[in-house]
């Protein structure tokens, strides 16, 4: 059975209704994702297009356009930096809770089967860009907002949801470090990113 918790209700659906030989599971999965977004956006909650690693209860999200190397960068952290694990590799969930931004695993993790029912305090968000050398800068204000916003899912044409998305993004920019990393897919990029995130 597939159990789905929605705001104010619960749903239980038998997966035997979804034929393996059709596209039913693909469409059903996307419908659930849409329902989740519709039911949680106004609750200080956003679904991201990102890859997230965690260590000691803290989370670090890597954003970027499709093909930028989010999954690759996460794998570099797992390979070269001690104590990190993958939380989600495609669509993690974030929520503002008591002046902290919490990042959660989700049932949607793209090509990487990483479906963890875990959470962490989101400490930093890094927008990745492919480049010929490794360089990182801290983002603040409107630059931080502009870097984070494109990776947030939601129905922005609906006023109430657009306002909720805006408020949550502002909260993230106030509570988390946001950075822009131009990088190669190498160990140096992972170490530079990690070091900069943890600088005081």
Features from the language model and the residues they span:
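Short aromatic/basic micro-patch
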Residues: 5-6, 47, 119
